[in-house]
């Protein structure tokens, strides 16, 4: 059986006795605080494809970081241990669920114009809310261009998303941009790209 990550998603192959996972740690090296969680989930899910029938299964994992916690916890199917380790890491760096992460994406066909508006917005926000939230950016989004639109982003960290969003929406209503520049806000986004 040869496949992509798709084979991890709930398919039942009762005669599969060997599963190999190539570059299992590749997802660990992306700019996303959930990278360890996604890596752990993928390994556990793919491992679950082997040995579903009457015959025992075996899993071979290729990794360049065999001692990484997600790899080791997945190797032992230690869900509780992984959860405790991951929560401790997130507490240490103050990532969700310990505070909210809000992504503010600006996009448009003219990169200079998009960059101009996101920089102006960052100044407005810093002046109005700099004491109540942590602002990171602006920066080019990890996927810089989609469908001929350039993308830039800001990140906001806050203890309460609802209060911050209300204030941001209020400020945003008074912030004028050209019609060909768009923005969107995502609270605790699942994807950071």
Whereabouts are the PLM-identified features?
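Accessory helical-bundle/CTD segments and flexible terminal tails appended to RecA-like ATPase motors
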Residues: 1-31, 45-193
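Short, conserved loop/turn and helix-capping segments at secondary-structure boundaries
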Residues: 33-40
């Amino acid at each position: 059986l040869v496949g992509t990550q798709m084979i991890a998603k709930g398919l039942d192959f009762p005669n599969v006795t060997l599963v190999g996972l190539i570059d299992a740690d590749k997802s660990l090296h992306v700019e996303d605080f959930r990278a360890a969680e996604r890596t752990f989930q993928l390994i556990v899910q793919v491992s679950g494809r082997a040995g579903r029938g009457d015959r025992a299964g075996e899993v071979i994992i290729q990794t360049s970081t065999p001692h990484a916690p997600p790899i080791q916890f997945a190797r032992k199917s230690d869900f509780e241990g992984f959860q405790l380790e991951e929560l401790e890491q997130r507490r240490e760096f103050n990532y969700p669920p310990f505070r909210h992460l809000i992504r503010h994406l600006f996009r448009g066909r003219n990169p200079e114009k998009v960059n101009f508006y996101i920089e102006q917005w960052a100044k407005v926000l810093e002046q109005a809310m700099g004491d109540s939230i942590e602002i990171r950016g602006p920066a080019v989004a990890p996927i810089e261009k989609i469908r001929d639109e350039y993308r830039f982003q800001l990140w906001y960290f806050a203890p309460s998303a609802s209060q911050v969003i209300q204030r941001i929406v209020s400020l945003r209503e008074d912030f004028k941009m050209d019609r060909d520049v768009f923005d969107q806000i995502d609270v605790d986004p699942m994807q950071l790209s």
